[in-house]
Amino acid sequence: MTQTLPAGLTATAMVAASSANLGPGFDSLGLALSLYDEIVVETVDSGLTVTVEGEGAGQVALDSSHLVVRAIEAGLRATGCVAPGLVVRCRNDIPHSRGLGSSAAAVVGGLAAANGLVSQTDWTPLTVEQLIQLSSAFEGHPDNAAAAVLGGAVVTWTDGAGAQARYAAAPLRVHPDIHLFPAIPQQRSSTAETRVLLPDTVSHTDARFNLSRAALLVVALTERPDLLMAATEDVLHQPQRAAAMPASAEFLRVLRGCGVAAVLSGAGPAVIALSTEPELPAEAVEFGIANGFTIAEMAVGDGVRWSTGVAAGR
């Protein structure tokens, strides 16, 4: 049985950017960042209106193919609801196609906005576990999606494949001494474009290397930030992607040469540095700025949140 939502319901969702992989944790580790998109959705009698401010304005579709709209509709279907019409307003601060989880944020934010609508009815909103499952199914892997749902850092895993895949995540508490410095270039790149650069198989030696570093990274993130340099080494995906984003690869070399644990953020081309120092070395900052990177310190991001009505602002 499907319930049609009445017109006049309004909900707001706030969802964080995220950095996946963190070096060795390919498709497994994720970290939310304190950079947020806001979604406001209202039920109306009929039709669909989509507006976008900020990142993606004038570039993304403003119809039912918009990722936020698809996620809202999927969230409503999963709870047994349908909207007669929708007005969707997106205010985006997360850069698109840079490796900062913008698509995961769109999906998680849309699902959360649907929860905000459903919470005003007698029907039951999606649980956290359902949010992770649905958003990860959209993405095809759970690292960014789970980080956006839960906030903080996450270890994620997948059981099964295809339509039977089940996604799960466990939260990690990031050590308070760790400072996060995302560096965002003008260059864009999609995950699909860079995945084709990766080989179908890897050597046992390389697999063993990354397994040890990914395990060490969990320790470094939570208890021993002094181990971050060793823990962020990777041989499975960053070297293979370097030719497609030479400025990012060189910036990583400069940062790590200065003793800063730096990795590609997701599939790149953004870079993220994890440091116990409150500032990055001047040499690295100068290189980044000269090569078109915008560098800013961010905190660990919060998990997605939703509310009824229109938020007063950020």
UniProtKB/Swiss-Prot annotation:
Entry keyword annotation includes RNA-binding: no
InterPro entries cross-referenced by the UniProt entry: GHMP_kinase_C_dom, GHMP_kinase_C_sf, GHMP_kinase_N_dom, GHMP_knse_ATP-bd_CS, Homoserine_kinase, Ribosomal_Su5_D2-typ_SF, Ribsml_uS5_D2-typ_fold_subgr
Listed GO MF terms: ATP binding; homoserine kinase activity
Domain of life assignment: Bacteria
Main location (coarse class): cytoplasm
Pfam families for the chain: GHMP_kinases_C, GHMP_kinases_N
Keyword annotations: Amino-acid biosynthesis, ATP-binding, Cytoplasm, Kinase, Nucleotide-binding, Threonine biosynthesis, Transferase
Enzyme Commission number(s) of this protein: 2.7.1.39
GO cellular component: cytoplasm
Subcellular location, record wording: Cytoplasm
Residues that bind ATP: 95-105
Functional description taken from the UniProt entry: Catalyzes the ATP-dependent phosphorylation of L-homoserine to L-homoserine phosphate.
UniProt record similarity statement: Belongs to the GHMP kinase family. Homoserine kinase subfamily.
PANTHER family noted in UniProt: HOMOSERINE KINASE (PTHR20861:SF1), HOMOSERINE/4-DIPHOSPHOCYTIDYL-2-C-METHYL-D-ERYTHRITOL KINASE (PTHR20861)
NCBIfam families membership: thrB
Name the UniProt record assigns to this protein: Homoserine kinase
Organism ancestry: Bacteria, Bacillati, Actinomycetota, Actinomycetes, Mycobacteriales
Gene that produces this protein: thrB
